[in-house]
Amino acid sequence: MTNLPSLSQLEESVHDALNQRLKKEIIQSGGSISFSLLMDIVLYDEEHGYYTGYKEQFGEPGDFITAPMISNIFSRCFLNSFKENFVHLPSSILELGAGNGQFAVDLLIAAEKNNILIDRYLIYEISNNLVKRQQKIMQKELSNEFFSKVEWVSEVPEKFEGIIFANEFLDAFPTNIYEIKNKQIFERKVGIENNQLDWKEDDKPNLELAGIIDTENLPTGYIFEYSKNLDEWLNKFFKIIKKAMIFFVDYGFCQNELFHQDRTEGTLMCHYKHHAHANPFAFLGAQDITWHINFSHISRLAKIAGCKVSGFVSQANFLINAGALDFLSEHDPNNISDFKIQTNAFQRLTSPAEMGDLIKVIGIAKNTDVSLLGFNKNDRKLQL
């Protein structure tokens, strides 16, 4: 924590306001609250929340950079896969949580340039602040014709048919934190210690999770995340869509990788001014809080809902399968400055040391045939 930047005066006032609200919630709840409630408040509070308040989250002035911001290769590769799936589906796209809007901008520009029909581009976004930013960049970058195809929705449309895409959407759902002790599961709640927010272990083991998580080989002290909020949202989501190919892109693992004896401290991560750390009680409302997705669990929920898992690959494999090297080859190596920028961007997207292996792509189909472009090599769905 000592190497992290200092809060601005505005950020300090936001932190203090959220800190007081959380302490009040803890006192009113008898001494502790779930971590998911803390996460919900600090990320989504109407006035002070990280995503819903004043904060600039993305790019150099923000706290982190997402894949679409690195290069339009990312969006163009997904458009290649979407185009193949439009053979079986209406030419409509629903993006869940569009961030700063860069993915939609790059995809729609490429679609117009290559005469790929897009009937509608829907964006599901709960943050009015982000909607305004997305509208601003799209109105600036898109032609009038393609901007007119974009529509913002506050609920996932029932009986939607088309492509559904989500990049770093699942890991923003509030999650609870749990710890293994003598093969039993205890929730790590949030309490007050010495007038500061701190972890507080629940007194009783969580029997509900015992039937979901196999704790037999997990050591005492092992920490993990589980989001009932995400489960409930996905169960409803899979039920209401009618016919779709779904692409979830996020940091995460198969269950056997996630629940490994060497991964004992959980995956909770905070980002502030491009610094990563693991203290969720610092910089309230000024930092992002995320966790890594259990893709095996996502797969199970999808199958229970009658969907089919079409593929599961690393981001690097998806992009290369879907044409990233072809897009890179469009740039002239003799233009040293431009080519260096493009190759560096490609490395960030595909390198195992960067996003390439840490981020995964899962394809889920409901009531449709699918094209496997993006998943056609190095598919790991059998490991889920």
Language-model features, listed with the residues they occupy:
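Conserved RecA-like P-loop NTPase ATPase core
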Residues: F74, I164, D250
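Short, glycine/acidic-enriched loop or turn micro-motifs at the edges of active sites
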Residues: N128, L170, F253
